[in-house]
Amino acid sequence: MDIKVVKGSITEVDADVIVNPANSRGLMGGGVAVVIKRLGGEEIEREAVEKAPIPVGSAVLTTAGKLKFKGVIHAPTMEEPAMPSSEEKVRKATRAALELADKECFKIVAIPGMGTGVGGVPKEVAARAMVEEIRKFEPKCLEKVILVDIDEEMVEAWEKVLGLR
């Protein structure tokens, strides 16, 4: 599977579906979620909350609202908003997002840094966990993962793990 690293906004990449590193309640109050909700509309959060609770290690698909994508995958890295995350939760969330994207037969999924914002997971730890899960995954439909973040340190961490730096 092709892995590409991009510095920029997840809302502007060319992908079929984007991932929101969520909480189990589906509330979109911090980090990447705020941007997705602001640009895509309240209906994204409404639908995620209706599908809650979303345990860490699972994921749900909602509308992308006004965004150009076919949907938003909400993959919790924490149970409650602003709760600390962990390397294991980042792994579970990444795996759950990939599994759902593949099950829905999307070709390209964009994933931001998982658990690195309010979750507090060090970027290098999250980058390694995410890349290892992506490399282990055996897709049926999924062809490409775009790792995208506005944070230069996150981008550098992915590039380092992938041997691009």
Curated annotation (Swiss-Prot):
Domain Macro intervals: 1-165
Source species, domain of life: Bacteria
SUPFAM superfamilies: Macro domain-like
Pfam families, sorted: Macro
Protein name as annotated: Uncharacterized protein aq_987
InterPro entries attached to this UniProt entry: Macro_dom, Macro_dom-like
